[in-house]
Amino acid sequence: MSGSIENYRKMVEQPWGRMFYDQIFTQLDISNDKRSKILDFGAGFCITADHYAAHHDVTAVEPNEEMYSLRVSENDYTLVADGIDHLKSIPENSFDIVICHNVLEYTDDKEEILVQLKRVLKPGGKLSVVKHNLCGRVFGSAVLADDPKTALDLLSDDNTEDSMFGNRNVYSGEELTAYLGKEMKLENVFGIRAFFGLSSNNEIKYTDEWYLPMLELETKASTMDEFRKVAFFNHLLFRKEA
């Protein structure tokens, strides 16, 4: 197993990793009053899948063995060790909610995946896409990493970066909306990690005195356009036309 995957797994347990998921769960706002069928495509360590499996029927699709071997499994969900081939085998209109977080940047068949995600989503269902945001990555490189050269490179016409998962091709929310077409209505856009990833003072992040006010700040700023534009991630929620 590569050390980078293991280090990434450890990172998501840190306060700055947990806050990412705390924001997502708040923004998704999935009610536990009704049991929903949820698909998490590109589930990674299955943190999101496991969270919702406590009250819902969840299928987690993840082809990377290194990642799913380190998955969270406190609750019961179905793990499918596959990718788009499994997606194509799912009957249409199967899921109430489809989740695809930080996946499309790393694939060459973005449009094909989106076609399949739309297909398996029930009419009236919700599609949740989390994506890297170019402006946020520029801030992160220039401020947190003290690497203005990389920040300059990100502002070039070629918005491609190397990562542990291969090339990361950052795309815009407008591109995503265009890919999905008229069948999917954009209902909301949130920012994630506008502030908490800019400080290298990690020691303070283990305290409630930092964590709770920072989470409140991130939550408030996530709906404000000025901060969505510079957040490290954007979270787009679409509704399939009934």
Segments the model singles out, each with a brief description of its role:
Residues F165-E183, V189:
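Short alpha-helix
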Residues E111-K126:
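A short glycine-rich, Lys/Arg-flanked "PGG" loop and its adjoining helix->strand segment in the class I
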